[in-house]
Amino acid sequence: MALSVEEKAQIVTDFQQAAGDTGSPEVQVALLTANINKLQGHFKANGKDHHSRRGLIRMVNQRRKLLDYLKGKDTTRYSALIGRLGLRR
């Protein structure tokens, strides 16, 4: 259920701040969002998979922490990221 190497590379190139940037909050949030979206499809077919649901909740919490960090550091980057990813906040 993980993202393929090509999908990860595409997300990194779309959200990186500079060449070779894989650790910025934008990249990390985008990768987590892609994983979360993929897992949501998994749960439509496998509703009782509670072990994977724990991993999903952990990813959602990690994404929330990164978004809170980015919001505190730079609200314009936060707003741009939320808009690009289509998140609710």
Curated annotation (Swiss-Prot):
It comes from the Bacteria. GO terms for biological process: translation. One of its GO terms (molecular function) is rRNA binding. GO terms for cellular component: cytosolic small ribosomal subunit. Keywords: Ribonucleoprotein, Ribosomal protein, RNA-binding, rRNA-binding. Pfam families: Ribosomal_S15. Part of the 30S ribosomal subunit. Forms a bridge to the 50S subunit in the 70S ribosome, contacting the 23S rRNA. One of the primary rRNA binding proteins, it binds directly to 16S rRNA where it helps nucleate assembly of the platform of the 30S subunit by binding and bridging several RNA helices of the 16S rRNA. Belongs to the universal ribosomal protein uS15 family. This is Small ribosomal subunit protein uS15. It comes from Pseudomonas putida (strain GB-1). The lineage of its organism: Bacteria, Pseudomonadati, Pseudomonadota, Gammaproteobacteria, Pseudomonadales.
